[in-house]
A protein has these predicted regions:
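Short cysteine clusters
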Residues: 88
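Conserved G/P- and acidic residue-centered "switch" motifs that form tight phosphate/ATP-binding loops
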Residues: 91
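Cys-dependent protein tyrosine phosphatase-like superfamily
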Residues: 1-85, 98-156
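Ser/Thr-glycine-rich phosphate-binding loops at phosphate-binding pockets of nucleotides
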Residues: 95
């Protein structure tokens, strides 16, 4: 992982257990994403290339299917320990929302509290976003991909 990315104070790492291994992804304003990172863009208002686009208005939540597809699409790059960047305009609300959904898919207890303790204390900014994570249940496809990705992670 390119540590020069952390010269921007709005960009922070987010570490978590991924099966038997530890993984770190990066979050912040999407405009700070380095070109060589796998990009998950949560901001409908930002027009930059990305690998996964989850179009979401500021202070809002995405469509369930879009978020679930985004979580699923992020799993193999994370498993392969590729540099992954999650971002929105400010790098807090929608960015934290994706991280919370990922944590929930990985069965991390209290995903909102986990994101706030391990990424940014103000991440997941609105009550609507908190409730969305509370109500998010990964689809069967996503649950199966979590199992596959955990096995893949052991090889990397």
């Amino acid at each position: 992982m390119n540590n020069s990315i952390f010269k921007n104070p709005s960009v922070k790492p987010f570490a978590f257990k991924f099966g038997l291994v530890k993984r770190v992804i990066v979050g912040g304003p999407y405009v700070a994403k380095p070109d060589d990172y796998f990009g998950i863009k949560m901001a409908i208002e930002i027009d930059r290339p990305c690998d996964v686009d989850i179009p979401t208005k500021d202070f809002s939540v995405p469509k369930y299917e879009d978020l679930d597809n985004g979580v699923r699409a992020s799993l193999i790059p994370i498993a392969k320990n590729k540099p992954v960047f999650v971002g929105c305009f400010g790098g807090l609300g929608r960015t934290g929302l994706l991280m919370g959904a990922l944590a929930k898919a990985l069965n991390i207890p209290e995903p909102v509290l986990y994101v706030r303790a391990n990424f940014k204390s103000h991440a997941i900014e609105t009550d609507q976003q908190v409730k969305f994570i509370g109500n998010y249940t990964p689809s069967l496809k996503t649950k199966l991909m979590v199992s596959v990705a955990k096995a893949v992670a052991l090889a990397y």
